[in-house]
């Protein structure tokens, strides 16, 4: 299976500089590969009526709870929060560990390959030694992550959102690309001057949304 067209899309994409250097690649996957993922029952299964039914379906299909920012690692804690009315939402993330579809498995192997890794690094002129992790994840209802930069140990993030729910476009669950409001830009300046300081999450009201990625 040839996935090299993905490399060409990365190489040919223009680097957008605002609010920070990034790529915005429309139709990143071919129609064939997108349809394959959208129709795969291991990934997109029928709607369930209870949290426990969702959990059972996920576990039986090779998904495991994944530690992730803004999320709990306890299914019982997630159920407790999602069934009540907490002051703040709490989410939970699952990662797929066993791929039933051979083509999807090959796609993930490709997106963890040296060739894919090298193409991303060359695009953004990254010369340090790095590793790559590509995976399929699900963020369940309640997931929300406050504005944040990447942790210092991470030099690049890529995100491919795939959802076959036609209502998703009407929901505010897009990725926001942000910049600090003027009165908070001193924080960014401090981070830039102090590379040994880990950066933190900040409140939404400190930032302006420059762009939404759907």
List PLM regions with ranges:
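Fe(II)/2-oxoglutarate
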Residues: 1-18, 185, 189
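Short, functional N-terminal and low-complexity linear motifs
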Residues: 1-7, 83-89, 124-127
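Non-heme Fe(II)/2-oxoglutarate
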Residues: 12-119
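Catalytic core of non-heme Fe(II) oxygenases with the double-stranded beta-helix
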Residues: 93-112, 116-214
């Amino acid at each position: 299976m040839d996935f090299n067209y993905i490399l060409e899309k990365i190489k040919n994409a223009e680097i957008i500089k605002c609010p920070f250097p990034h790529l915005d690649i429309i139709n990143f996957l071919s129609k064939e590969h997108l349809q394959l993922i959208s129709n795969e029952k291991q990934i997109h299964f029928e709607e369930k009526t209870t949290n426990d039914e969702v959990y059972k379906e996920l576990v039986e299909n090779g998904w495991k709870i994944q530690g992730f920012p803004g999320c709990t690692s306890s299914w019982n804690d997630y159920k407790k929060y999602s069934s009540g009315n907490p002051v703040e939402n709490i989410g939970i993330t699952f990662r797929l560990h066993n791929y039933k579809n051979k083509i999807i498995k090959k796609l993930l192997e490709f997106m963890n390959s040296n060739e894919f890794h090298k193409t991303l690094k060359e695009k953004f002129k990254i010369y340090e030694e790095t590793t790559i992790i590509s995976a399929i994840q699900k963020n369940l209802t309640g997931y929300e992550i406050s504005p944040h930069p990447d942790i210092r140990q991470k030099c690049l993030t890529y995100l491919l959102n795939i959802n076959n729910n036609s209502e998703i476009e009407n929901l505010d669950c897009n990725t926001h690309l942000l910049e600090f409001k003027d009165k908070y830009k001193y924080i960014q300046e401090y981070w830039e001057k102090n590379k040994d300081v880990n950066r933190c999450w900040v409140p939404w009201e400190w930032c302006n949304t420059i762009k939404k990625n759907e």
